[in-house]
Amino acid sequence: MRKIYATGKRKTAIAKVWLTPGKGELSINEQSLNQWLGGHEAIKMKVMQPLLLTKQEQSVDIKAVVFGGGYSAQAEALRHGISKALNAYDIAFRAILKPKGLLTRDSRVVERKKYGKRKARRSPQFSKR
């Protein structure tokens, strides 16, 4: 019985994922998916997407530790980590996950604030007179 480790990232959120063959148990920060997310069905589907695409929702156990960012970024980091772990588990899943963009790290992050500006791009109000 092999244990596979992978990390997923999105914005400032980081997910550490351990995948083992099992019966479909999903533990995130020592909680079930429903306890961790509450009633956010769309975000739950994001997390489950790689498992549903590869039809592994009943055959692998996933233990994850997620920190940083908000719920949506954490869910996408978790999805990225699960996808990478499934790819390491069986290389045949790459053909399913890669076209959906689940193995690609979303590199969009917050733009830095520049001096002389109020935010990244917002300038102070201009007065002609």
Curated annotation (Swiss-Prot):
SUPFAM superfamilies: Ribosomal protein S5 domain 2-like. GO terms for molecular function: RNA binding; structural constituent of ribosome. Pfam families: Ribosomal_S9. Keywords: Ribonucleoprotein, Ribosomal protein. GO terms for biological process: translation. Gene3D superfamilies: 3.30.230.10. InterPro entries: Ribosomal_Su5_D2-typ_SF, Ribosomal_uS9, Ribosomal_uS9_bac/plastid, Ribosomal_uS9_CS, Ribsml_uS5_D2-typ_fold_subgr. One of its GO terms (cellular component) is cytosolic small ribosomal subunit. PROSITE patterns: RIBOSOMAL_S9. It comes from the Bacteria. Belongs to the universal ribosomal protein uS9 family. NCBIfam families: PRK00132.1. This is Small ribosomal subunit protein uS9. It comes from Helicobacter pylori (strain G27). The gene is rpsI.
